Amino acid sequence: MKIAVLSRNAKLYSTRRLVEAAKTRGHEVRVLDVLRCYMNIASHRPSIHYKGEDLTGFDAVIPRIGASVTFYGTAVLRQFEMIGVYPLSESVAITRSRDKLRSLQLLARKGIGLPVTGFAHAPDEIDDLIKMVGGAPVVIKLLEGTQGIGVVLAENKKAAQSVIEAFMGLKTHILVQEFIKETAGSDIRCFIIGDKVVAAMKRQAPEGEFRSNLHRGGSASLVRITPEERSTAIRAAQTMGLNVAGVDILRSNHGPLVMEVNSSPGLEGIESATGKDVATKVIEFIEKNATRGRTRTRGKG
């Protein structure tokens, strides 16, 4: 098969591993910088060009689209879909999961466990917003943040008010969530391919930190997940319509709660924590499922 990997940087661990795994299994692979692709959006013969060349003959495309290039990255992916190339995850599923609010609303509609979450832009009654999610301590997030950036733990009401006011000054949208203290700065990342959890790791925040993102110095270790955690993670990925996803789950006293569904989960942390060859599993999934022109929108909303 001829596979395209949409990635800004061919040297990144995840991109390297996917290329390696595909080549080992006898496929032809090209890494394309998504921002350098340009498109002819025509109803007759839509095309994608890259460095002066018409990109044709691809059987599948693997999107590794960073949060900062979501808009253009998903547009390029949509163009690949238009010319009949099989996407590992569809453009609409990626945009759905990148919008934190939209994804939370969809998960809530499906009855999937979530932390109590308030959403606001310019609330007149900050006290009422804090009360709505069960009072301090609360976690306050910028809607557009990634990798733990723009996430603040406010330990008391006064701190929560100050942070919300500061964020409001930025003219941005704010998520206010209950703080699940029993997790003690840890979460579980489930790596989903298709309808299976192929690997899972526990991420632990460093001492004195509550954000467990590996980019923030968190550590990862192998973990056994419960059947309930497994089914929650799979349902969350399917609600987004993603074939490949990293679902972050908190172990609360009242069952698993989904924090986030990541459409471009990194491979380095999960492969080193679990010793599993996740990249090859991704390529095997493409081999089984890639047929030309087969994009259908899964999930609703």
UniProtKB/Swiss-Prot annotation:
Pfam families: RimK, Rimk_N. Its EC number is 6.3.2.-. Mn(2+) 1 binds at D248, E260. Its cofactor is Mg(2+); Mn(2+). Mg(2+) 1 binds at D248, E260. InterPro entries: ATP-grasp, ATP-grasp_RimK-type, ATP_grasp_subdomain_1, RimK, Rimk_N, Rp_bS6_RimK/Lys_biosynth_LsyX. One of its GO terms (biological process) is SOS response. It is an enzyme of class 6 (ligase). Binds 2 magnesium or manganese ions per subunit. Mn(2+) 2 binds at E260, N262. GO terms for molecular function: ATP binding; metal ion binding; ribosomal S6-glutamic acid ligase activity. ATP binds at K141, E178, F179, D187, R211, S212, N213. The keyword Protein biosynthesis applies. GO terms for cellular component: cytoplasm. Gene3D superfamilies: 3.40.50.20, ATP-grasp fold, A domain (3.30.1490.20), ATP-grasp fold, B domain (3.30.470.20). The keyword Magnesium applies. Mg(2+) 2 binds at E260, N262. Residues 104-287 form the ATP-grasp domain. Keywords: ATP-binding, Ligase, Magnesium, Manganese, Metal-binding, Nucleotide-binding, Protein biosynthesis. PANTHER family: RIBOSOMAL PROTEIN BS6--L-GLUTAMATE LIGASE, RIBOSOMAL PROTEIN S6 MODIFICATION PROTEIN. Belongs to the RimK family. HAMAP family: RimK. This is Probable alpha-L-glutamate ligase. It comes from Nitrosococcus oceani (strain ATCC 19707 / BCRC 17464 / JCM 30415 / NCIMB 11848 / C-107). The gene is rimK.
